[in-house]
Amino acid sequence: MEHTYQYSWIIPFIPLPVPILLGVGLLLFPTATKNLRRMWTFLSIFLLSIVMIFSLYLSIQQIFVSCIHQNVWSWTINNEFSFEFGYFIDPLTSIMSILISTVGILVLIYSDNYMSHDQGYLRFFAYMGFFNTSMLGLVTSSNLIQVYFFWELVGMCSYLLIGFWFTRPIAANACQKAFVTNRVGDFGLLLGILGLYWITGSFEFQDLFEIFNNLILNNRVNLLFLTLCAFLLFVGPIAKSAQFPLHVWLPDAMEGPTPISALIHAATMVAAGIFLVARLLPLFIVIPSIMYIISLIGIITVLLGATLALAQKDIKRGLAYSTMSQLGYMMLALGMGSYRSALFHLITHAYSKALLFLGSGSIIHSMEAIVGYSPDKSQNMILMGGLTKHVPITKTAFLIGTLSLCGIPPLACFWSKDEILNDSLLFSPIFAIIACSTAGLTAFYMFRIYLLTFEGHLNTYFINYSGKKSSSFYSISLWGKEEEKKLNRNFGLVPLLTMNNTKRASFFCKKTYKISNNVRNQTFITVENFGLNTRTFYYPHESDNTILFPMLVLLLFTLFIGAIGIPFNQEGIDFDILSKLFTPSINLLHQNSENLVDWYEFFRNATFSVSIAFFGIFIAYCLYKPFYSSLLNLTLLNLFQKWNSKRIRWEKLINFVYNWSYNRGYIDAFFKTALIESIRRLAKQTNFFDKRIIDGITNGVGITSFFVGEVTKYIGGSRISSYLFLYLSYVLIFLIILFFFYFEKF
């Protein structure tokens, strides 16, 4: 066992050869490297599989013998300072390594097909390999300096992958927004690290915790300064895990390829902030005010993310806000001191949300054959609908992921979210009400996404599919923007844009690529409607096996991964794997309880949380099930149609919620007005002062000297005698002034 731990330092470097060899190969042998591109994919998957096996082996050992292994090498710079670097293996490290490697492998398999038509295929896999190395280095770091180094590398990889299609202005702006927002958090993290080193004199986690606790117990340090340093440490995770108010970058990050959204912005990178708070929890836990701030930020993010997801039209942005809300649950659990619940939800959410993102990518991939290669159209849920019979496997996988996130048993997220809701009841009634209400909102917006995408008919080909008697309709311009138009009621179908279905554009050059034959030669389907028009249209098709296989594996994880943490304890014996891993575990809410959850309490709380979820699903079903169905006869909907006054109030409420959600809670607008515009004005004023005042003085002195020299040159007439005469005249004037000054003094 000790022999295994000695070689754990190699874990972060196993995926590193692929990006290095790809970079060298593309520089020196570009043609050969591109011709062997499938080999690089296989090599990436193979190396990450080694990491997964290694991590699984470490986890199995720690289940039976829970221990912490740390190995440190010291680099002495001088007698007063030495830099130590090494690796730190504990249950948290092994779990995160398994999570990174398993999701990473599935995303790489998925990406092989998803990115096959992109000219940046090799660049994509190089970035992915470098990201996996950075993330593994982060979770195995033994001190704060190493954490910060890999933290920055993870941010750089995120910047590169969000802006992967950098020729699109919206993607370029999105990666810059993510970079700048995370720099705010990273600066706070750096200040916190330096402050802690100034107090404790160490960067190592174990030494840091011991010294910090001793200082607190003996009152040998200013508590206010300690609190400030701890808060600055927390600012980094706020930005990285998209917590309020530094969450604004996450929805825009969806401009990157969909596999990136599944790996980085659902399962791993955004979880890095949760990981760091969990790693530093022994430090935070001795400062109650910091724990309360962590829980407060978490509960605000939980509610804000859920409300902002309510009216999103882009399927990936809706899932992004859902991710933000679920990360808020994890942060809330950590702030309450429920270490196990937070990490349990981190695991279950990672697999469920990765499944949903890969499912959305499969849908987008299928819609591109219909609406063309435009994210504004292929990701717009308003143009989807009726996909159940066209993509049945994707639909089933997406439904399982949706039910899991809603908290429906026995799926993965039910077990972890239920623990957090139970702990919130013990922590604060107000927090519990917000957390439980948000569970209902989660079920509502997730089923809204599902119903808009899969139920009804394909809305791309239909007008007036909302069922309203008088309405204006949205047509799609050539560039994917919605334009409001009044359409003729005599026509039952929206005329399609003229599209060339034999070619697919690339963002990087004018060359086009043919779409595979299974897209071109798909069966034509005739849609008859209103008796007047019979037209022939394309319909989406199921994705290829290399896209479906990772989704099916994640579906199995979503079904069964919750079993590792089912909280059934009897006679002091832990039956779940997580309890064996996290021994001893930090739990401030169950300090005096031998059995965390008994049968009666579990079923009572589970019944309550599941009832809330089903209520949210029911409301979503009533509002978003296609209006041409029999649901119009439901009493709930007829109430709003019969009572005009209540209907007006209801519509005002709906419009308020819609505007709040669609405009991102006006937070982006506030930042733009209060920060961005102010900084721009300051920059313009600084630029004016620098160029007109500072440069003006410098240039004025130079120009004055030049003119004085020119005047002197012409007065002297280019003769030495004239220069001597002027020189002596100036000396005489100077002596006269000096004489009068000296005479007046005496």
Swiss-Prot record:
Gene3D superfamilies: 1.20.5.2700. The lineage of its organism: Eukaryota, Viridiplantae, Streptophyta, Embryophyta, Tracheophyta. It is a multi-pass membrane protein. The keyword Transmembrane applies. GO terms for molecular function: NADH dehydrogenase (ubiquinone) activity; quinone binding. It comes from the Eukaryota. GO terms for cellular component: chloroplast thylakoid membrane. Coiled coil: none annotated. Keywords: Chloroplast, Membrane, NAD, NADP, Plastid, Plastoquinone, Quinone, Thylakoid, Translocase, Transmembrane, Transmembrane helix, Transport. InterPro entries: NADH_UbQ_OxRdtase_chlpt_su5_C, NADHpl_OxRdtase_5_subgr, ND/Mrp_TM, NU5C-like, Proton_antipo_N. It holds the Pfam family Proton_antipo_N. NDH shuttles electrons from NAD(P)H:plastoquinone, via FMN and iron-sulfur (Fe-S) centers, to quinones in the photosynthetic chain and possibly in a chloroplast respiratory chain. The immediate electron acceptor for the enzyme in this species is believed to be plastoquinone. Couples the redox reaction to proton translocation, and thus conserves the redox energy in a proton gradient. Belongs to the complex I subunit 5 family. It is an enzyme of class 7 (translocase). It is found in: Plastid, Chloroplast thylakoid membrane. NDH is composed of at least 16 different subunits, 5 of which are encoded in the nucleus. It catalyses: a plastoquinone + NADH + (n+1) H(+)(in) = a plastoquinol + NAD(+) + n H(+)(out); a plastoquinone + NADPH + (n+1) H(+)(in) = a plastoquinol + NADP(+) + n H(+)(out). The keyword DNA-binding does not apply. It comes from Lepidium virginicum. This is NAD(P)H-quinone oxidoreductase subunit 5, chloroplastic. The chain crosses the membrane at residues 9-29, 40-60, 89-109, 125-145, 147-167, 185-205, 221-241, 258-278, 280-300, 327-347, 354-374, 396-416, 425-445, 547-567, 608-628, 723-743. Its EC number is 7.1.1.-. GO terms for biological process: ATP synthesis coupled electron transport; electron transport coupled proton transport.
